[in-house]
Structure formats: structure tokens, C-alpha cells
Amino acid sequence: MNTFGKKLTLTSFGESHGVAIGGVIDGLPAGLKIDADFIQSELDKRRPGQSSFTTARDEADKIEIFSGVFDGMSTGAPIGFAIFNNNQKSNDYENLREIFRPGHADLTYFKKYGIRDHRGGGRASARETAVRVAGGAFAQLLLNELKIEVLSGVLGIGKVVSDKIDFDFAQNSQIYALGNEEAMKEAVNKARSEHDSVGAVVLSVARGVPAGLGEPLYDRLDSALAAALMGINGVKAVEIGAGVNVSSMLGSANNDEMDELGFLSNNAGGILGGISSGAEIVLKSHFKPTPSIFKEQKTLNLAGEAVDFELRGRHDPCIGIRGSVVATAMIRLVLADMLLLNASTKLENLKKIYG
């Protein structure tokens, strides 16, 4: 499906080498101040071509908003926007017209649809995530009204793990590293010099989230967040709170005890029973190494024959770097959606509006 969310929805369109990518945000309340400069600044964080640690494809990623905004305020109507593609090099992919790239969605898209756009992965390209970043920025404008913030940074690249968790540092880091930036850069450069790629772990936190968000049983907050993050290109695992470590804990260690001031620990990552507890929400997204590598590889062609091929084009050596910006956006979209869904949960909420 190409639409995300229940009450607040984002529908995206476009392909990597098409005319444009874009989206429609529906369900954003009327009367919200739309800060176009903020939205553009979020897109700039993800924009390619800004350093040697991302793809050389240099797109301006300037957003054009077509509808749903009047005098700088949301009208309650769908907000349509587009980001035009200007730096495609489709000829770089001509040798892939008859070939399925290992680690990519080429084979599976062809098996599902019987047709595929070989130019940069088409619809399956991470180019589409610019739309999610824009959508997440719109969602953050709503979250700002409730003083909710979402922060992400790169916790590790390859075997290098950050020596600290500093989101202020990450915002000023060229690779959004939470710490140990130079060692992480070295890991990326080493992989790239060997015509290879490297994976990453992204840490995200949401602060100021009120207790009560989540729609049990089948749209729990934790499952919605996990699905949103797993839907990002290259994410292969998501952890919440203490994550996989809880399987080796005793209950006495895992339980987050409480006193008058709140929780004494946060192994649950701010979510209990699929509902936000009021504690900080903590998530980790594990990104696989970029499948686009410049080594000769064995694969199949459209005829099902084994062939050797070597990739051309422009690609990120570590997708987790820009992926950290996308993770922030998806968490924002989920939280904004859950806020709107939760608004009618209690009768007293309806009475405040209509009583």
C-alpha cells in the first residue's frame, strides 16, 4: 500500500528517476501554522550529495506545496506537495535492464508485478523517503503544539559503537553520529575504499509523549512504531527499550519499578501493553549494508540465467546515515496519528469539545 496512517495519513507517489516524488497529507487539523522553512530544513538534513558519506546524486529536494494551506495555516483539506527530480542519470542503470541486483528489490518487484523500473530501483528506491521526511515534518508541527520532540542519531556503524549518546552532537555531526564520529567515518571510508558498504544502528527517542497513546489490541503503539521503522528501506530489525536483551533478563531486572516521581528504569522503552506510559520512548533501528556495491557479483538475468555483473551509478556507502532522518520522520507520523486517534477515546474528551 502507498498510504500510511489511520487518522493522519500520508500517501506518497513517484519513482527514483521519474519527474517527481510527492505526497498528500490528509487529516491534519485546520488552524495549524505551517512553517515551510522548517519543512525544508528537515528535507535538507536528508538531502543527497552533501558529503562523501552519502550518494553523489545532488538533488536540491525543494518542496512545492500545492494545496491545503492558506495564509500560512492548514485548512483541514488534504495537503499536496511535490519534490522534483533534477539529477537523474538513468544511463548508469541501462546494464540492469535485464539483470536482478543482489540484495535489492529487483527480483521481488518483478515477481509481484511482472514489470519493473530498472532505473535506480524505481518505486523501491530510498529516493521516496524524502516524501516521508516531508510528511514527518508536517507531523512535527502538530507535535510541537504539545511539546513533543523526536530525536535520532547514529549509534553505530559497522563494528564501531558510539562512546556516548549526545543528540546535540548528532545534530552537528556530518554523519549524525551520537559520538565516536571519526571512527565511524573511518569505517565508512574503509568499506567504500574496498568498493563495499557497511551497516548501521540508529537510536531514536521521543520525549514529552503523554501516557495513553496506542490502540490495543491490533494497533498498539509499539507495533505501529516497529512497522513504521521496518518499512524504511534497509531496516532489518527494530528494538524497543532494552530490546533483545530482555530475553536474557530475569523479571526482577526487566520490570521498571515506580515511585512518586515516576519510573526508576526504562527497559520497556516508554510503552507498556501497547500504550505509552509517559516515559521516554526509546527505539533502535538496524540498517543492513547498502546492497549497491561496486564489486563483481553473481546474479540472474530475466531469462533465469546465471551472470556476472558489476554495478555502476551513485550510491550511499552507508544508508543508516540518512536513514536516521527518515526514522525521525516515521516516528513523528506515528505519534501524530496516535494523538488524533486517542482524542475520542474518553467521553470527557468529547464533552470538552461538544458539551
From Swiss-Prot:
It is an enzyme of class 4 (lyase). Keywords: Amino-acid biosynthesis, Aromatic amino acid biosynthesis, FAD, Flavoprotein, FMN, Lyase, NADP. The keyword Flavoprotein applies. Reduced FMN (FMNH(2)). One of its GO terms (cellular component) is cytosol. GO terms for biological process: amino acid biosynthetic process; aromatic amino acid family biosynthetic process; chorismate biosynthetic process. It comes from the Bacteria. FMN binds at R123, A124, S125, N233, G234, G273, K288, P289, T290, P291, S292, R314. It catalyses: 5-O-(1-carboxyvinyl)-3-phosphoshikimate = chorismate + phosphate. NADP(+) binds at R46. Its cofactor is FMNH2. Pathway: Metabolic intermediate biosynthesis; chorismate biosynthesis; chorismate from D-erythrose 4-phosphate and phosphoenolpyruvate: step 7/7. This reaction introduces a second double bond into the aromatic ring system. PANTHER family: CHORISMATE SYNTHASE. This is Chorismate synthase.
